[in-house]
């Protein structure tokens, strides 16, 4: 079973839990994971910048950070995904994409990172983008809000 808890900074209006859970559950099951305990935390730029600096020694804004809490060779997944809602909105404008689709993509992206996918090279980025596009086609992300 894929268990997902969602925490939201109270200054934001968050996406529908059911759609977020559908996206992440679909990624996990499609990638062969039947047991997962995930925490999705939706916050702001400062939260993610602090995490990026503290854990990676990099001082800049980012839209998503994922931490796998157990070993990658384990069949179950325990992890946390942090998303900056303002950064997702800015990136949606930058990439001329709807906010809902960009948020769906970032949720999927975080899930893929928990599974060991990396975006540190051009080829790895392309592989992740293919997976993101595939899963965006398969799940109804269009109603993340409202």
Where are these regions (language model features)?
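An acidic/histidine-cluster motif and surrounding catalytic segment
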Residues: 1-104, 115-146
